[in-house]
A protein has these predicted regions:
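Metal-dependent de-N-acetylase/amidase catalytic core
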Residues: 1-15, 94-229
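Active-site rim/loop-helix segments in enzyme catalytic domains that contact anionic ligands
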Residues: 1-112, 138-143
Length: 229
């Protein structure tokens, strides 16, 4: 086993690029926490306010509620800056990719980032907005000379979630996974609870966290020849 496979890249500044408020916690939370524990600064670029979610754990205007939830979760995770944009939830695929990428370029330059962290190109849950947010980061990366690291699921976890919940979960075979890291989920769990409109009992989130245990799985999407690793 490659010893480096269990260590995150030694980045001092990371930009997480996501589609919705809660993606930074439900999806990337434990990895963000691990980067921060290693001394990195982490910023988040979130393209939508998540106003189209069908999960409504609280009453009220969902876009406004979820903006507040994201702010609270970011504080718990230790995120430095959140860039929250107002693209339509569920409509990122219709937005100009180069325009989305420009936002990622700007945020990465603002924080002098060493790399970007995203959802896998599968979108993990098959959500088209997840796929589009990742594409924006992948387009931006070579223009700022950055690597892109993707959070993914191993096939066995995705298959079990699919069997139990009939959702569109998409994993990767072990040969396509570059990192298996041990994580402490304490900050992630606290951040998840900052999203009461979405962290509803019995949702796929809880079953996924149970199946993953204290591990997360990552793969390279973009490697620059001269980028820091």
């Amino acid at each position: 086993v490659n010893e480096e496979r269990g260590k995150l890249p030694a980045w001092s500044s990371v930009l997480a690029v996501v589609a919705h408020p809660d993606d930074e916690s439900f999806g990337l939370g434990a990895v963000i926490s691990a980067f921060i524990d290693a001394g990195a600064r982490v910023d988040v670029l979130c393209f939508t306010k998540g106003e189209a979610s069908t999960l409504r754990g609280v009453e009220g205007d969902l876009g406004t509620i979820r903006r507040g939830e994201l702010t609270a979760a970011a504080r718990e995770l230790g995120i430095t800056t959140v860039h929250l944009l107002d693209y339509p939830d569920g409509g990122l695929t219709d937005e100009d990719l180069s325009e989305l990428a420009e936002h990622a370029i700007g945020a990465a330059r603002d924080a002098a980032c060493d790399g970007m962290l995203v959802f896998d190109t599968t979108g993990i849950t098959g959500h088209a907005d997840h796929v589009r947010a990742t594409k924006a980061a992948v387009v931006a990366a070579p223009l700022v000379g950055l690597d892109v690291l993707a959070w993914t699921l191993p096939d066995e976890v995705a298959d079990e979630l699919h069997a139990k919940l009939h959702g569109d979960f998409r994993g990767r075979p072990s040969k396509d996974i570059d990192f298996v890291i041990e994580v402490n989920r304490q900050r992630q769990q606290t951040a998840v609870h900052c999203h009461p409109s979405q962290a509803v009992p019995g949702s796929a989130l809880w079953q996924r966290l149970d199946l993953l245990g204290d591990r997360e799985y990552l793969r390279w999407l973009v490697r620059q020849e001269n980028a820091a690793t």
